Regions:
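Terminal accessory regions of large proteins
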Residues: 1-191
Length: 191
């Protein structure tokens, strides 16, 4: 309803794209065949893991590339993307863009994600202190991932803040390319 759909590498938001997709399949095909239908989709996508993990991975890594191909590099969904570490990603529908969207994205999603990383890092710090040697290696690797994502997201938050303060209005008649460029610092690069 707020035109912001987070794409996460874990279940951080109730309304992330994977959760919404699962809910869509549940509503259309029913609860009884949900797992079977998710497995069908996951098998079609390919990849390793549970059906939900495969679907999550597709949205995180491949969906936007497919979307750009479909729309010949003039996307109607825009991917807000913090960078290679996947610190933060979210889709918005261009035709529903409103000038306060970046402020909402920043406060309702970016800040929320930053808080999740702080919580995860605190919990991992405690767990590492009390872990066995083999477990410590695994937890330290997770900690490094979260530290990298948090650092990436901190830099990204500053860029989003700068653009949010500008309260940018778009004119759909200017076209996707022009409007996308207004937000180039915070959107995925079109390749």
């Amino acid at each position: 309803s707020d035109n912001i759909i987070p794409i996460c590498d874990d279940e951080y938001f109730d309304d992330d794209v994977t959760g919404r997709f699962v809910e869509f399949v549940r509503k259309v095909y029913g609860e009884d065949t949900l797992e079977e239908n998710l497995k069908f989709v996951a098998d079609a996508l390919g990849g390793k893991g549970t059906p939900r993990e495969v679907i999550r991975s597709y949205f995180l890594d491949d969906f936007y590339t497919d979307h750009l191909k479909t729309y010949q590099k003039r996307p109607i969904y825009w991917l807000f993307d913090s960078g290679k570490k996947n610190g933060f990603k979210a889709l918005i529908y261009m035709h529903r863009y409103q000038r306060d969207l970046l402020a909402r994205l920043r406060t309702d999603y970016v800040h929320e994600q930053q808080e999740r990383y702080r919580t995860q890092l605190a919990q991992l710090g405690d767990a590492i202190d009390h872990a066995s040697t083999s477990e410590r290696v695994k937890l330290t690797k997770q900690q490094k991932k979260f530290q990298d994502q948090a650092a990436e997201l901190q830099k990204y938050e500053e860029k989003v803040h700068h653009l949010a303060d500008q309260n940018i209005e778009i004119d759909l008649d200017d076209g996707v390319k022009h409007n996308y460029e207004l937000f180039a610092d915070v959107l995925a690069k079109i390749k």
